[in-house]
C-alpha cells in the first residue's frame, strides 16, 4: 500500500490548460482534442500517481469550459461484445449515457455521440443509436473503412472518411472522449478534420493521452502500469521512431499511435499541404510528466497497480473460462518492474487464514500498515468479518466487543434463506453495514465504528475466493482496492453476476 503525495495536482491544472491554449493558438482554427483515459473518474491515474485526483482532467478543462464542446465516442463492436467498464461494472453503452449526464451536470456542452465501426448487421448498435436519438442526442454513424489505417489513399477520400456522418459542433475546442480505449476517438477526430476541410473550415488535431507519459523512460513503472492496464488490447509501449528520426531524441509512445501516425501526417499534408507534426509525440499535449513531485513514490504505486492488474486478469479469465493470454502479458510486465505477488502484503495474510481455517479468508492493510484479517464463520462471510474487525480497530474498540449480536444476525439469515431463496446464510458486507447502522441507533460502539468507514478509502484488500457482485460493489464504493485468488468458494457451472 502506497501513502504520500507524488504528484502536484494544482501545478498540473495550470500547466495543462495553458499548454492546450498554446496548441489552439498554433492551430489557428478549430481544434479537435482527442482525450484519452477517463476524464472525470480516472482511478488508474490516481492510483499510479498519488496526488492525482480522479477528477483532475475535468477540473483542468473547467478552466476553459466556455470554449469547450464534448463529443462522446463508442465502438459499435464493443456493444456487440457486451464490453463492461471494469472499475464501475457497467456496460459501455450505459457509461456513455452516464458520461453525457456528468458532463452536462458540470456545465459542459455535449450533444453528440459517435458510433464508430458501425455495420448494419450489428443490431445492438443500431438499436442503441435509435435509443440515443429518442433521448434527444445527435448520433453520427461512422462505418468500417477497409484498410484503416494503412490504406491512406482510401481512408482520406470520399470513399473513406467521406462516408462518415459529419458531427455538427459550435465551439472551437472539441474534446473527443469515450468510455474506454479502442473506441475510435482518433478516427473520429481525423474524420472531422477531413469534413471541416471540405466545408472550408480550418481545423487541426491534438492528442491528450495521460499514458504512456512521453517524457518518462519506456520501462518506467508508471508507463508499464499502463501496459498492464491495456493488456487485453495488446497495447505496448514503444520508443517513438518518428521522433527519434526527426529530432534524435528517445521519447515514449505506444504502438497504436505509431501505427496511425502516417495516416495523420498524410491527411494533414493532403488537406493543407504540410503537417505541423513530425512524430506522434509532437501531436500530444500531455504535461503530466512535468508534475511528478516524488518519482520513487510513483514507481512504487505503479508496481502495486501492476500486481493488482495481474490478479484482475486471473479472475477475469476464471470467470469467463478463457485462456491465460492476458494474465501472461501482465506477468511479463510484472517481471520487468521486479514485482511479484509477494509485494502485496495482504495476499499472504489472507491465504494464511484459509490455510489455518480451511475456509475462505480475507485481509486488509490499513494506512498505518496494520493488517486486519477476516475468517468465514456460521454468521459472517470473511469479507464482512474483516470489515467489522477493521472498523473496530480504527475506532479503538477491543477485539472481544461484538458490534452485532448473534440475535440481530439470525433474523437476517432467516430472511435470506427461508424467504429470499439464498443458499448462503452468511451476511455479506452490505448486510453487515445495514445491521451496523441499525445498531448505531442505540450503541455508541456501533456509531464509533461507522464513523471510521471513510478511513478505508485507498486500503488494499485480498480475498482467497472470487467476490460476488455485492461485495465488489461495496468495496468499490468505499474506495477499497480489492484483489482475489482466481477460484470460487463453491463448485458450480452457473455464476450470478
Curated annotation (Swiss-Prot):
Domain of life: Bacteria
Gene3D superfamilies xref list: dip2346 domain like (3.10.630.10), Domain of unknown function (DUF1846), C-terminal subdomain (3.40.140.40)
Disulfide-bonded cysteines: none
Pfam families per UniProt: DUF1846, DUF1846_C
HAMAP family tied to this protein: UPF0371 (MF_01567)
Family statement: Belongs to the UPF0371 family.
Protein name: UPF0371 protein cu0538
Organism in which the protein naturally occurs: Corynebacterium urealyticum (strain ATCC 43042 / DSM 7109)
